[in-house]
Structures are given as structure tokens and as C-alpha cells.
Amino acid sequence: MARRYDELRHYPGITEHTTALASFSEAAPSVPRAPGPYTPHRPPQLQAPGLDSDSLKREKDDIYGHPLFPLLALVFEKCELATCSPRDGASAGLGSPPGGDVCSSDSFNEDIAAFAKQIRSERPLFSSNPELDNLMVQAIQVLRFHLLELEKVHDLCDNFCHRYITCLKGKMPIDLVIEDRDGSCREDLEDYAASCPSLPDQNTTWIRDHEDSGSVHLGTPGPSSGGLASQSGDNSSDQGDGLDTSVASPSSAGEDEDLDLERRRNKKRGIFPKVATNIMRAWLFQHLSHPYPSEEQKKQLAQDTGLTILQVNNWFINARRRIVQPMIDQSNRTGQGASFNPEGQPMAGFTETQPQVTVRTPGSMGMNLNLEGEWHYL
């Protein structure tokens, strides 16, 4: 039996627990217990059928007086500490030496070596009852396996926290998405302004100004700069000329090159073809008074653009938020003299015979333009 215990796996020993283990083994049977159904290292006070109190007390004394009971109590306490005590990844797990944690499996193996060295000098490891010896060894092994599983859980938690913190310190993918969306919005406004020459000068100026401010995609126009606006207007005009030529003469010599460039840009950013967006923009600015296509109109637009009805619907939702709503907000800031006219006419052109124009945008209140040129919320 002694050789069977010696064949168990041991780790490097420690000596600080020797005195505590020796005193614990001698005093364990006579330690007073607090009243209650459960006490530390004791089973519930239940009496099995057919056993009197004397025989039950005798069996308890045999367990508490067994040479391996102090080791059983020690591993049980380590399991409790590993379950209840807070664990810091800086002191245990990541980058810490083996056995550095008092509740780790390495420290328990060190305690086994110290306990075996101490107990052999005093008395044998096993008693005269083989059944009780087997029970004690199996109980220690079960708690040992439990301690190993707890340590695995702690290591996984430490590893997850380390990887999560490392990920937070890096650049978030949302930053790349925002940068790409800013560039997409500016290009959409450039193409749209160039493809709609019938827009009033004030609306074209608004688009140029807000292209420089970089706040169009949020719907909050910023202050414009004269030099930047002029430069942006020149660039927009150049791009608009190329776009008009491409649409008016599809069989031109540079069409293939433009299509290849467009395919590469679409593949990189995942946007719709420029021809399709031009068709939908034209419809949007022809129906600014009510930029909500019906189901039949969506089907027709889907056929004209080669997109699905869902893609057409999503594009109009984004366009009302990114184009129509900022134009309405800008017209509210400029005042009555430069109010936004959905039909592209100056405010002085309204007469008493003209109906009121209502502009509704998703996620906001409707706005009513009366005959006096004033905006009212519906």
C-alpha cells in the first residue's frame, strides 16, 4: 500500500506546510464544531438506517484519525480558495512562474511532497483498514481532479482577458468603415451635383460647401470656406463633364476604361453601379416634394437600374437621410429669403394658385411650406 502512494505523481516540495499538517492530523478528531447541518470537512449529520450512534461516531473517528485526512482537508481547502478567491492575471496564469498561486495544482503537488516527507517520519501512510485507505485515496484524487479543472478555467479566463484587452488597444474596424463612408458620401454628392444642372445655384453651392466640411453623412452641415468651396466646385465640374459625356454617348472611346475603373471601385467599396445611382438620383430630384417611390415605381426603377427592389428601397432610405434631410436643415438655417424649394424654383415664383408643398423625411417630422414661404412642422 505504501508503494502505491509513492508511485503517485509528485511535484517539487515545500516545507512551510509541514508543521501545520502535523498539528492538523493530531488535533482534527477533537476540534470542536459549530452547530449546524454542515460543518467544514464534515458530512451532514444524517444517520443511516441500521447504524446506531456509537458505530457512526466510531467510523467518523476512524476517518478523522486517518493519516491521510490532513492531506484530504488541505486539498479541499485549496478547492474552496480556487473557487471563491479573486484571481489576478498579473499574479497567476499569464507570465507567472509555476506554483506561484497558493491555490494552483502545482502548489498542491508541492504540499504532497512535503506531507509525504513529514508523515513517513512519524507513522505509516495507511491504516489497518484497506477499505478506509482506498476511500481516502479516491477522495483525494477526486478533489485533485477538481482542482485541475478549476485551474484550467482560470487559465482560459486569463487568456480571454489578455486577448480582449489587446484587441481593444488596436484600431477598431469601425474606424475604417467611417473613413470609407465619408469618401463614398463625398463622391455621391459630386456626381449628383454634376448630373443635375437644373438645380438652383443655392443648392449647388450648398453641396460644394458641405463636401468641404465633411459632415454631409451625418446630416449636420458645417461652415464653408471660400477657397475650399471654389476648388471643390472646379473638381466637381470636371467630374460632372466626364459623367455627362459618358451618359450621353455610351459608345465613346473611353467607355470601356471608365467601366473597368468603376468595377474596381465598386468591388472595393461595395457600392451600386454609377449608371444605376444616376437614374435613382434623377428620380429623387424630380420628386423632391414627395421622395417616396411607390411599389410600382420601385419595380420600374429596379428594372431600369438592374438592381433588386430591396436595393432600390435601401438606396432611397439612405438618400433621404443623407441628401434630402441635410438640404432641409440648411434651408431652415438660411431663413425665409433662401428657403429650400423642392421644385427648384425661387420662392418669389409662388402664387396663391400654387398648392402647398410638403416634404417628409424618414426619422423626422414632416415640414410644410405655405404660400408665404414659411416652414411649419406637421
From Swiss-Prot:
- For this protein, the DNA-binding region equals 265-327
Q: Which residues form the MEIS N-terminal domain?
A: 99-182
Which residue windows does the record flag with biased composition (Low complexity)? 230-244
Q: What Gene Ontology molecular function terms does this protein carry?
A: chromatin binding; DNA-binding transcription activator activity, RNA polymerase II-specific; sequence-specific DNA binding
Tissue localization of expression:
Expressed at high levels in the brain. Significant expression also observed in the heart, spleen and lung. Expressed in pancreatic islets (beta-cells and non-beta-cells).
Query: One matching Pfam family, short form?
Result: Homeobox_KN
Q: What does the UniProt entry say about where the protein is found?
A: Nucleus
Q: Where is this region: Disordered?
A: 24-57, 203-265
Its keywords, alphabetically, are:
DNA-binding, Homeobox, Nucleus
Compositionally biased intervals (Pro residues) = 32-43
Similarity comment: Belongs to the TALE/MEIS homeobox family.
Output this protein's name: Homeobox protein Meis3
What species does this protein belong to? Answer: Mus musculus
Gene that encodes the chain: Meis3
